[in-house]
Amino acid sequence: MTTAPVVHSLREQIREHILEGIISGRWQPGERIVERRIATELEVSQTPVREALRELESLRLIESAPNKGVRVRNLTAADLEESYPVRAGLEAIAAELAAERLAEDCSALEPHVAALYEADRLSDGTGQVRHTVGFHRELVRAAGNSVLLHTWEGLGIEVFTALSIRWLGTVQQSYAEEHEELVAAFRRRDPLIADLVKAHVLGCAPRA
């Protein structure tokens, strides 16, 4: 059985474009993001650009002010840290719901662990972010609960992880071993798996 390709709306595509610009450093903290310029660049109307910017504002990545337009927020460690207790709670629930499924089959997690070993070896921060987030997304997806996955995605995990590394330098030398240990814990049906996942996520939080 083949999986149907995911079709992203125009708004989602624009949001991803802006997110990539923030993560890559195209737009620096405090820098203005011009709605009209993005619309021209992507050859779209300003309406979906405005909708995408609203979503990013709800994630606290940008801020708007009357007569000043939209700017990238100057995020602090405290700002970034706030999402981690919520994320840890969600992933602990996901670990409990997914425990039996992942005990039998961890194939969705294993490629990310292998990729993390390679990213660690190369000190590839971009790869570390991509596969750390990919690992945790597959963990949450394995819970089989669409509300849980939607809520987790709504936290902006990937962009906050990337920004904490880019702006705050919260990079670790090794990401792979901790994630391999979680795979081993799922395989052995560790009764404390939810606590292990929660502690792991909280341990990744930037410190104010």
What are these regions (language model features)?
Residues 86-99, 133-170:
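Hydrophobic, amphipathic alpha-helical faces that serve as interaction scaffolds
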